[in-house]
Amino acid sequence: MPGVTITTAVRTGPTSATVRESSQAFFIGLAQRGPVDEAVLVRSLAEFEETFGTYVTYAYLHPTVQTFFEEGGTQCYIARVVGPGATTANVILDDGGPSADELIELTANGPGNWAHSMQIQVTASGSLRNIKLTYNGDLVYQTGNRASASALVSAINNSAIASQYMTATLLIDELPGASAAVAFGAGTYTDGNDDIGDSTVDTTFTAYVSALDLFLDSYGTGAVVCPETHQINTQLIAHANSYNRIALLHLEEGTSDPADDAATLSAEDHSEHAAVYYPWVFIPTDVNGVNKLIPPTGFVAGKRALAHNQTGPHQPYAGLVSSARFVNGVEVDVNRTLGDSLDAEYVNAIRFIANSIRIYGARSLSTDTDNFRFITIQDTVNGVVIEANASMEDLV
């Protein structure tokens, strides 16, 4: 039709424009790059990739965040985890003279060998200097011609683009010499390494638990998730209780007894703050016909966000509202009999029902079924507590 252009594309952002604070998620995990000393708020997969990079084979964080947004999520905080021996790559710019006086230190935005793909070049135009940054061979930032080292440093540190890749520290306020492109971590510069292993996740238990501290109380309520491991489920529950949040939990891939695994978690203190979901789910990949198996918590967090934004924290994120838009398979086919038995053991099944994949349960892990049978009860209480605390701030 003349004058009409139709464009198709894969969704990479939230599917709802409404954002209730209670709908947000807090994700801990491994990433290609990014800071490790703060939690970063992102509102789309594109924003996530700008700071934390693209998919890496050893991590579940990227596909979990992707699933969250595809299934209705609107915003989440990300806490990146690295190993205990992680190092951050750098480059030092000198005056180009015989003494090689060090003038500016450029440090990658977070540990890891991803920084080896960054190169820095200094160009000269008379008495002015310009610092160019390339990543994977593409020019991503340049300072423009500046008259002093302090001006170069200021330009880098005040740039939203440059800060995704590096920070600058002024050592001596003298102009650096012109130089050919040099890679971060090359030669005598500090190498970058995230210390998480080549093909298996060997990041320490302590690193995951410590990352929970990055989710500050001031960020409000929401759901906390760690897709990389089920081994910190107890700590996720404790965090959720302390910060008026919900812990969305998964079990080990291929577990033969999900009910028994959930029973152990039900015995934990404050289990009314947690819900467990089974089985793992499949999502599509960039390769046509190839799917990837991931923990179900990104899917659940997305449907929780959708329910909160459409209705409120009292709305169960199960049944019709949880019909999958992106998830396309389940690890185990849960029939009605198995689903009912799992529900009796505080496990929320994800099932193929009415030609769609849906969450088939809204149980919390609490054995106090008179007061906390459903996870939405604690979700509602959390919202009331947060609003009450906010209202009383002016009276304190």
Predicted regions and their residues:
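A glycine- and small-residue-enriched flexible loop/hinge signal that marks low-structured segments
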Residues: 1-396
